[in-house]
Amino acid sequence: HSECSKLSITSYAKAVVPHGTTSMISGLDEYISVSDLDGLQEIFAEVKKSPLKVFWGAPYKTPYTVPQSTVSFNFTKKVHQTVQKWPECFGVWETVTEFVQEEDEDTLGAIAEAGKNNLPVFGCAPMASGKKLNAYLCSGVRLDHESYDHVEVVEKMRKGMHMLIRESCVTHFLAENMRAVTEVNPYLARRVSFCTDDVTATDILEKGHMDNLVRLAIKAGVEPMTAIQMATINSAEAYRIDHLIGSICPGRIADILFVEDLQDFKVDEVMTNGNMVARNHKLTYELKAPERSPIFKGELKCAKTTADDFSYHVPIENGEAKVLSLDVKGPFVRKRRDVILKVKDGIVQPDTEQDAIMVSVVERFGKNGNKSLAFCSGWKLKKGAMASTNAPDDNNLVVMGANAEDMSFAVNYLIEQGGGQVVVEDGKVIEFLPLPVGGIVSDDEPEVVAAKEAKIDEAARSLGSDLPNPMMYMFFLPITAIPDYALTDAGPVDYCALTTYDPILELVEK
């Protein structure tokens, strides 16, 4: 998901190619969620002018959410009948376990179409095991990038999956997952690859990209050449593109990294498509972003809000409410937390002392005007609000805050600006990161976006948060494939029950 870096394809290439990343496998699904197939063709055209190759997997469906949320474009089985025949299509992207388990019509249709076109099916199966995993694999999924520990990795590999070990800026699984190779069975390395999934511009500039994962694997005890194979030929074979890339031999594309020391694995020079394109962590030529069409101008098609939109009304005047607060225990762990909150004048009052604040997702594509509202914990905001239109998987507008007034101000500001990320306090903007391309990415230089990322996180921490990436933790909330709770424009979601829930558990009038 290059879009989570908030960098456009052009800017992303400027950041990652000098670190040795020459190809990316992606569904480009965030771009699709805010545009349509015409928008996708624009991104394909942008890729062709970049030194970074993108091997596209057609998203198994959009939206990815259960129950279904709102996006700009719905990717259905009928769409698959067309796009799987495109030359850009190399498979079906990130098929989530629950959609197979529930026999979702579009998902099974996409998989069936892939069988007709001899295309591989890529997976997303966090914490799947036993019979649930067996049934999932029978659908034809060949690989996964969602394992929380090495035991999960080993089970999936023993059942025939190719495993991508993920190390993102908020999920640090590589050291633990690599134990499958360093402690259980070194021969498993042949079917292990790497995945960054979601990384910020800051992370890329400070640590690197795929080269960083190679170094981390070596540090974890993997032989340098084996770690390099994980980042090259193993990945190419997993995605069935090894006839094009992944090795230096006749008939393959000349993507070559020049490295002095395999142990340190610091990339000095990069060749893509037979041309020297990067040296000393910089491209050797000027790369310009394309002129953006109206599809990606970033207009938010939603009405201005008021504080009342973010006030939780209940049918008692005064008293107490027992609420279910979505409690973040990590970027991909959301648990239930029951909290007693005061009710005043018919409105449930957020309580910063109990770390129980409000969170909402506002539909921004002009489809239905949905605004969900729920309670959340873990951010420890004492004041203000923060909001983002970069919010996978739907990229609706997510806002959270200690009070309804600042939440409304943050939403209205992003509507005026055409998208981005903002932190506000007492009706004033503390920091703003503009994302003019579809409301999700920027054509600015990676260094510029990274500097703004740092200021946004610093501003969020000034409101009281002690999370490492407060904004990123927030904008992951709409992902319903993460246990145990999520929030979309359709409402708060119970991952286990695959349905929305009422956050008000009990009311006591006083």
Placement of each model-derived feature along the sequence:
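Divalent-metal coordination cores built from histidine and acidic residues
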Residues: 13-120, 185, 430-434
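Di-metal (Zn2+ and/or Mg2+/Mn2+) metal-binding site signature of metallo-dependent hydrolases
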Residues: 1-13
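Active-site microenvironment of metallo-dependent hydrolases
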Residues: 205-221, 225-510
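A generic structural signal for well-ordered alpha-helical segments
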Residues: 16, 47, 114-115, 136, ...
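Short, ordered loop/turn segments at secondary-structure junctions
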Residues: 1-2, 28-31, 59-60, 97, ...
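Divalent metal-coordination and catalytic microenvironments
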Residues: 20, 92, 156, 197, ...
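Structural motif
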Residues: 22-24, 52-55, 89-93, 119-122, ...
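Histidine/acidic residue-rich metal-binding segments in metalloenzymes
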Residues: 73-93, 99-165, 172-194, 205-219, ...
